[in-house]
């Protein structure tokens, strides 16, 4: 089954770094996406805030460059996580992260 998502946007919540009891580092943040997409011949505003989690040592170095306001592209897979309040939320598990050059 295919499960791939590529999403670019702006980091809108400060990254939270944790290490699991088994020693695996995790970095969590929220990515806000805004764009104009074409659907059925019409332009529409597309907007979402997607929680992102980066797990493992491979991508942790780049997470130290990520702050609120960073523009990035994330590629990975999506999965549901159940919150402490019992509600489920969709989360993007990052496998590749690329900083978008602001051109400044």
From Swiss-Prot:
One of its GO terms (biological process) is DNA replication, synthesis of primer. It comes from Citrobacter koseri (strain ATCC BAA-895 / CDC 4225-83 / SGSC4696). Involved in the restart of stalled replication forks, which reloads the replicative helicase on sites other than the origin of replication; the PriA-PriB pathway is the major replication restart pathway. During primosome assembly it facilitates complex formation between PriA and DnaT on DNA; stabilizes PriA on DNA. Stimulates the DNA unwinding activity of PriA helicase. Residues 1-101 form the SSB domain. The keyword Transferase does not apply. Belongs to the PriB family. Pfam families: SSB_1. This is Replication restart protein PriB. Signal peptide: none annotated. SUPFAM superfamilies: Nucleic acid-binding proteins. It comes from the Bacteria. GO terms for molecular function: single-stranded DNA binding. GO terms for cellular component: primosome complex. Keywords: DNA replication, DNA-binding, Primosome. Homodimer. Interacts with PriA and DnaT. Component of the replication restart primosome. Primosome assembly occurs via a 'hand-off' mechanism. PriA binds to replication forks, subsequently PriB then DnaT bind; DnaT then displaces ssDNA to generate the helicase loading substrate.
């Amino acid at each position: 089954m295919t499960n791939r998502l590529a999403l670019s946007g702006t980091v809108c919540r400060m990254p939270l770094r944790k290490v699991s009891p088994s020693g695996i580092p995790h970095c969590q943040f929220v990515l806000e996406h805004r764009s104009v997409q074409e659907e059925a011949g019409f332009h529409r505003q597309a907007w979402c805030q997607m929680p992102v989690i980066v797990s493992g040592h491979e991508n942790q170095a780049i997470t130290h460059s990520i702050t609120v306001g960073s523009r990035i592209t994330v590629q990975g897979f999506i999965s549901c996580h159940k919150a402490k309040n019992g509600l489920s939320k969709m989360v993007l598990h990052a496998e590749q992260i690329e900083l978008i050059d602001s051109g400044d």
